[in-house]
């Protein structure tokens, strides 16, 4: 079950609307509310991270739907958030058990955001792929996590998983690109 520290994600009329939106996004994430996360995204959103380098539109929301559906013990902590007219930033931590190996993962992530029409139109998350692979995949990840072929394999497997999820997800829970 996801953990939410209500004091950790406060929004306020005194905050810039973009900072409030970032906090709303991560509060939904911590509640395991993929629909709430997707509502923060512009229909033309572009998402990227080391595992999903190019997701457009509904693919981004479906990626979160898939990840939340698979993460039985996810805890999300928003460590920092800021936003203004030029963009936004967040530092957050995900703690979960990697389902394919049963290994615990603590992933420290930095997010950059751009906005259009009061919604997130660009979302780029960055984290150490080697550190993630070392935790998620164990000794193999530690030994090979810095090599491009492992990253390509993880990306391919993730893309295939998302394609399968999108093919099987009910239409009312998917937004098309």
Predicted regions and their residues:
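Short, low-complexity N-terminal intrinsically disordered segments enriched in polar/charged residues
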Residues: 2-35, 39, 43, 155-177
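Generic, low-specificity signal for short hydrophobic/alpha-helical stretches with a mild N-terminal bias
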Residues: 7, 19, 42-49, 60-63, ...
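A beta-strand edge to alpha-helix "cap/lid" segment located at domain peripheries
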Residues: 9-12, 68-177
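Soluble or luminal CAZymes and related metallo-dependent hydrolases
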Residues: 17, 59, 105
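Hydrophobic pocket/interface hotspot
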Residues: 22-25, 37-38, 45, 60, ...
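Aromatic side chains
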Residues: 25-29, 41, 47, 52, ...
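A solvent-exposed, acidic/Ser-Thr-rich amphipathic alpha-helical stretch
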Residues: 34-38, 42-88
